[in-house]
């Protein structure tokens, strides 16, 4: 979910 994109920072 959206949290996955956050983890890519």
Swiss-Prot record:
Subcellular locations according to the entry: Secreted
BP-aspect Gene Ontology terms: neuropeptide signaling pathway
GO cellular component, one term: extracellular region
Entry superkingdom: Eukaryota
Family statement drawn from the similarity comment of this UniProt entry: Belongs to the FARP (FMRF amide related peptide) family.
Protein role: FMRFamides and FMRFamide-like peptides are neuropeptides.
Protein name according to UniProt: Extended FMRFamide-3
């Amino acid at each position: 979910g959206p949290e996955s994109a956050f983890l890519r920072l």
